[in-house]
């Protein structure tokens, strides 16, 4: 009986981890000088290891997703270039 309860609880915990929403992390930076803005990525395919291309005030950077909302995924597009923006 106890093993069945444990199995059910384990399965519920596992599913909540797998099915939870993922977001770009919220940036701790609120502003950036124009000469410091750069894009390390323009889309998720530019990132490696399961990280996402996330927008920050200082440009786009590869970040690992988190379960806390607040960040913003990079829009990409044809005008996006990976380099300094100025």
UniProtKB/Swiss-Prot annotation:
Residues 21-66 form the WAP domain. The keyword Disulfide bond applies. Contains 5 disulfide bonds. Keywords: Antibiotic, Antimicrobial, Disulfide bond, Secreted, Signal, Toxin. Disulfide bonds join 24-54, 32-58, 41-53, 42-80, 47-62. GO terms for molecular function: toxin activity. InterPro entries: Elafin-like_sf. Residues 1-20 form the signal peptide. It is found in: Secreted. Has antibacterial activity. This is U15-lycotoxin-Ls1a. It comes from Lycosa singoriensis.
């Amino acid at each position: 009986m106890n093993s069945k309860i444990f199995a059910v609880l384990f399965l519920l915990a596992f599913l909540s981890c797998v099915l939870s929403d993922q977001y770009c992390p919220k940036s701790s930076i609120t502003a950036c000088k124009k000469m410091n803005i750069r894009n390390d990525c323009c889309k998720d395919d530019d990132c490696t290891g399961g990280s996402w291309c996330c927008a920050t005030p200082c440009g786009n950077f590869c970040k690992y997703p988190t379960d806390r909302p607040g960040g913003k995924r990079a829009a990409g597009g044809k005008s996006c270039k990976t380099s300094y923006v100025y």
